[in-house]
Curated annotation (Swiss-Prot):
Organism: Apis mellifera ligustica (Common honeybee)
Result of changing I158T: In strain: MELLI1
Effect of V138I: In haplotype 4, MELLI1 and MELLI2
Protein name per its UniProtKB record: NADH-ubiquinone oxidoreductase chain 2
Membrane-spanning segments: 10-30, 57-77, 91-111, 121-141, 143-163, 170-190, 192-212, 242-262, 267-287, 313-333
Length: 333
């Protein structure tokens, strides 16, 4: 058990190191090699402590297909052929990256895999394993109007598509696919803001996943032990959904500010706001069920004075105060 934990944590450190090296390299071929090393480590991480090997096989198959095409495209790219300067070649390369990160229309494999993964695997798939190909895609290709059309279509489609699922894992899979637009577009506009976003996003996502993993929450039929545990879940969900007054909303707010300053992005901003409201509505549906269950089962809650879950109230209050304080500091002072 100790060896498994040691190997698991070292693989994560290797993956972080690969991502840092990629951000400090301008050579496309070196970035591709680092991405492939990251893929090997990612498959190992998905397999560790997992009895179900299907998600790793799916991810391996998708990675092999995209990597083979990317390898030949990189060779053509480095040969300086005039075809590589065209929008067609640019879009073909981007489609291979979209396949790897599971965006529309290649989203089915990711949503299907999330249902079979545990929470630790979902955290890795939604953060480190996703950031590496996104960074290389923005480094290698040009984010033009066709890319923006495709990304905004992905956001609108996923925000509607997520409404049909009744499992928490599939909803988080759709949420991860939806957030791909933010990662790609922010990286294109401002690299420093992208780094700040992935750190904040990973931290918030880690808190949410740790909570779900600790209490073994798998679907919408969960029941909380007390109201403080429920308040913690509500705070984590609002924070993850980038809801106003929470620190995570600052990233979305800054992106909106940058898009408003460029009039060419106004139509994208309008569609993004619509898709964002639809996605937040999907989160609110979860919270509505939590409130309904709270009212129905409130008599079954454990006595607050005698239970060991009292610390959740302090955690929720601290997290909420921290978010509001930083939100006010960064935007009004």
């Amino acid at each position: 058990m100790f060896f498994m934990n040691f190997k698991y944590h070292w693989f994560i450190y290797f993956l972080i190191t690969i991502f840092v090296l990629m951000m400090n390299s301008n050579n496309i071929f070196i970035q591709w090699m680092l991405m492939e090393f990251g893929t090997i480590i990612s498959i190992s991480l998905i397999n560790i402590k997992s009895t179900n090997k299907t998600p790793s096989l799916i991810y391996y198959s998708v990675s092999v297909i995209s990597s083979i095409f990317l390898f030949f495209m990189i060779i053509v790219y480095l040969s300086s052929i005039s075809f590589t300067k065209t929008d067609t070649f640019n879009f073909m390369v981007q489609m291979m990256f979209f396949l790897k990160i599971g965006t529309f229309p290649f989203h089915f494999w990711m949503i299907y895999s999330y249902e079979m993964m545990n929470w630790k695997q979902i955290f890795l798939m939604s953060t480190l394993i996703k950031f590496i190909p996104i960074y290389m895609m923005v480094s290698m290709t040009k984010i033009n109007s066709w890319t923006l059309y495709f990304l905004i279509t992905n956001s609108l489609y996923i925000s509607f598509y997520a409404n049909k699922f009744y499992t928490l894992k599939k909803l988080l899979a759709c949420s991860t696919i939806f957030n791909s637009f933010y990662f790609i577009f922010i990286l294109e506009l401002n690299k420093n803001m992208f780094i700040a976003m992935i750190i904040l996003y990973s931290f918030n996502y880690f808190l949410l996943i740790s909570f779900l993993n600790k209490f073994n929450i798998q679907n919408f039929n969960f029941m909380f032990y007390n109201k403080y545990q429920m308040y913690t879940f509500l705070t984590l969900m609002f924070n993850y959904s980038m809801y106003p007054i929470f620190l995570s909303f600052v990233i979305k707010w800054n992106l909106i500010f940058m898009m408003v300053s460029v009039k060419a992005y106004n139509w994208i901003l309008f569609l993004l706001m619509i898709s964002s409201m639809l996605m937040i509505w999907n989160y609110i549906i979860i919270l509505k069920r939590v409130f309904l269950k709270m009212n129905f089962y409130k008599n079954n809650f454990i006595d607050d004075k005698d239970n060991k879950y009292m610390y959740h109230s302090y955690f929720a209050l601290t997290l909420l105060s921290f978010n509001i304080s930083f939100f006010i500091t960064l935007n009004f002072l």
